[in-house]
């Protein structure tokens, strides 16, 4: 019964939906170097249909801040009007691995000045994301992303690249 309640509320323990130890993590990951603005370039999901919330939030610029090793991600997204969403990623004892309610993020590959490739697993959704400091990356980085996506057994047809207009919420 507890497992059912945890599933309903999105707080799934690792033993129910474990993240594979085979997912690579950047050695010597330095969270401080990720602070600042990141532009989403692309994503891949294991599902043919991306959940509605992910469709809205994934293509939007993300701002990264750090507090005591935890990452605060802030993104603006369109939902009729421009809104802001914030997520807290709690650091773990393994650099480059972060937990959030109902899931985990692993930093798979990074050039702190250019791009970031990360893996996210929730109880009902698995995805990989490519973000960049600028509004685009070269074909070599897109190929690296594609290679990592395929190595994690994501379907190639589920890779998509963004071309989204950004928004800024108006002050209340």
UniProtKB/Swiss-Prot annotation:
Example GO molecular function = small molecule binding
Entries under Gene3D superfamilies matching the protein: 2.40.128.20
* Pfam families reported in the protein's UniProt record: Lipocalin (PF00061)
Which InterPro entries does this chain map to? Calycin, Lipocalin, Lipocln_cytosolic_FA-bd_dom
Query: Where is the protein situated, by its record's location annotation?
Result: Secreted, Extracellular space
Chief subcellular location: secreted
Q: List the disulfide bonds.
A: 82-167
A cellular component term, taken from the record's GO annotations: extracellular region
Q: Which UniProt keywords apply?
A: Disulfide bond, Secreted, Signal, Transport
What are the boundaries of the signal sequence?
Answer: 1-21
Q: What tissues is it present in?
A: Secreted by the epididymal epithelial cells.
Is this entry keyworded Glycosyltransferase? no
Similarity-based family: Belongs to the calycin superfamily. Lipocalin family.
What function does the entry list? Could transport small hydrophobic molecules into the epididymal fluid during the sperm maturation. Binds to the head region of spermatozoa and plays a key role in sperm maturation.
Listed name of the protein: Epididymal secretory protein 4
